[in-house]
Amino acid sequence: MKIIAKKDLFINDEIRVREVRLVGLEGEQLGIKPLSEAQSLADASNVDLVLIQPQAVPPVAKLMDYGKFKFEYQKKQKEQRKKQSVVTVKEVRLSPVIDKGDFETKLRNGRKFLEKGNKVKVSIRFKGRMITHKEIGAKVLADFAEATQDIAIIEQRAKMDGRQMFMQLAPISDNK
């Protein structure tokens, strides 16, 4: 049973329905009970009555220690946030007239970024009259993509944006 967000839960006296489908401490079904009987069962067991599915017909309420539940819920959320990995986009800037050695250095940097799980935006800035030779820039980007095809896929093909041509690569492991 999926439990909704903690701020949407009604507890004990906050519950305003006539009858509830009651779930016990161990998750067993106790049947449909009037609210007063469910509340007295909760008081007798020294636990809280928590409305966990208010939109169901009849609404579902569970006997539980709300303080403990809230603590476990927050702990679980914290663990999930820890496990989340943030994918950043790193940029490698090239020139349409880049030399082989410089290209190899930029390629090595791009490969490092991809191996760490980051996406790589490869951009070429055209200066002055270079803009008339867009095919040279496209060839440089194609060479970069070909050199990284074993560890990356092209997420966004080469495209012009003003005086800049760029493409985006993503590590293969992210897309499996």
Curated annotation (Swiss-Prot):
Pfam families, alphabetized: IF3_C, IF3_N
Output the PROSITE patterns linked to this UniProt entry: IF3
Gene Ontology CC terms = cytosol; membrane
Report the main location listed first in the record. cytoplasm
Against InterPro entries, the record matches this protein to:
T_IF-3_C_sf, T_IF-3_N_sf, Translation_initiation_fac3_CS, Translation_initiation_fac_3, Translation_initiation_fac_3_C, Translation_initiation_fac_3_N
Where it sits in the cell: the answer is: Cytoplasm
Asked if the keyword Protein biosynthesis belongs to this entry, the reply reads: yes
Which is an annotated GO molecular function term of this record? Answer: ribosome binding
Give the protein family. Answer: Belongs to the IF-3 family.
Q: What does this protein do?
A: IF-3 binds to the 30S ribosomal subunit and shifts the equilibrium between 70S ribosomes and their 50S and 30S subunits in favor of the free subunits, thus enhancing the availability of 30S subunits on which protein synthesis initiation begins.
Q: What is the protein name for this chain? A: Translation initiation factor IF-3
Q: State the organism named in the record.
A: Streptococcus pyogenes serotype M4 (strain MGAS10750)
Which gene is transcribed and translated to give this protein? infC
